[in-house]
Amino acid sequence: NAMIQEIKTDVAMRVPGIEAIYTWKDVPQQRFTIAGQTWPEPSPYDRLLLDQHVRFVGDPVAIIAGENEACVERAMKMIKVKYEVLPAVLDPEEALDGPILVHPEDSWKALCPVGADNKRNLCAQAEDGHGDVEKVLAECDVVVEHTYHVKAAQQAMMEPFQTVCFMDMYGRLNVMSSTQIVYHVRRIVSNALGIPKSKIRAFKPRIGGGFGAKQTAVSEVYPAFVTWKTGKPSKIVFTREESQIASSPRHDMAVTVRMGADKEGNIRAIDLYTLSNTGAYGEHGPTTVGLSGHKAIPLYGSLDAYRFRYDVVYTNRMAAGAYRGYGATQGIFAVETSVNELAEKLGMDPMEIRMKNMVKEGQFMPAYYGETANSCALDKCLARVKEMSGWDEKYPRK
């Protein structure tokens, strides 16, 4: 976490083959998001192409354009940067309403009412529920309560992030990228460069894996800016190291579950709280966290009450993003582990407690946006798994 006090590029510019070097003083000062989401994006507009305020190790400081990789690497080593190092907040438990702000700037904005407040380090916050959770839990014969930590993880797709840009005969900026969000890229580049979408054509070939990482425009805006400024073709290809330290991993979440049941094994209440660490920027932060509850709690269809609360906080770590499961992975791990612990306390077969409580076709699901499970074969799937695995012969362990 630091402010750039001074950046010297004059020596680097003299390297043969260097076309241009851009710093935070050279880029548009309109904030945007690189999350691949439908407009208006739930993710806050909290990024600049280059910012005087760098928020994590991996934040870009300069864009260097040259004729080949060798001259660019040489020039990069000649850029001198003087920083004012600031205190950092690295623990999400300390971020909310803490003294260190990741985004103190007034130009930060949220387009959607997701409970975001940059002056509280909040990317999103919400609560919903049905029934009186505290009353029902107090009536339960058995209650389990634990916090489960799911750490950030990288997609590590075979093809790293890469983008090629060029101007065509119609004066359009062409952006060819390894992306999962080709239409969103057009809008993101438009916002980042401050140019009309009609001046941009975004397209993609087949991509060598994405798994959600490429639902964020990690690489596109930098060569797009270079080509728009110079009129010349440009490309960027992340190394494997760069793909690991400056991209879009899974959100680190701490999920606290309280779950109660009667002595017959009927699960009556679930209280779930998720603390999600979005890192230095808010890409997909407000949306992944919702699935940690809305995809986990509705698996149990006969609850008398539920409550789901969450906070998504900024920290001075690499920004997170989309990853297969999109937040449901973290929540389901926590809830299913709680069900196992509940079964152990009750002395029940964990398969039996699931068959007894799982959502069935036709059931109303208040925890899933008030929808009905119009098509659901979860009970049949679990029965088939039980049969194929020989569960009754293996449980309890002989």
Cite the ranges covered by each PLM segment:
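FAD-binding glycine-rich core of flavoenzymes that anchor FAD
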Residues: 153, 225-243
